[in-house]
Amino acid sequence: SGLLQSLDREDNTEARALYLQGYDGNQGYIFDRIMRGKNIRIEAVCLSVLGGIQPGKLKSYIRASVSGGHGDDGLLQRFGLLVWPDNDSKYINVDRWPDTAAKTQAHATFKKLDDLQFNVDEETSAMLPVEYQFSPEAQNLFDDWRVEFETMLRNNEHHPAMESHLSKYRKLIPAIALVCSLADGEQAVSYDSLLRALAWGDYLKSHADR
């Protein structure tokens, strides 16, 4: 909640714009620093936000987004992995050893991702992003899903704020599929990776509906 509150301040509009633009991960960004006499350009902005927020505080941002006020600029919709907790009155004590094998596997995956190599421009020596594509089977699955998804978005059964949120799934689903694919060391995004992403998307939509 501290991050969202800081982005609400009038003197922090530039930071809010950075978070809005950094969602796509394929653009640069210029910080205007007049007092220092120069602008600061970030060639490629890609932001990930990890954290938690109390449901009560989140409600105020949802209301601002739905009402069409100052919060209706698409920032909240960019938090596509948000989940809403269950209110379980029964306490269950969980006391078990950490899964060492899973922790080791996770660290190995993080190391593998950190070692990914960029392409290099032969003339300028500039680093270029590596492009990953769907496998033919995954592409067919994505095309079928996209037709069904776009039809659902156009059925006029959702609030405009919900439509805005769900429209981000056009990027979110391929992004999750790519994460799954990279974690598994695939050369192309496979059918199974996309299938996992679609299942995750169904789960996230159920929480968005809440």
What are these language model-derived features?
Residues 1-210:
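Phosphate-handling catalytic cores of nucleic-acid transaction enzymes
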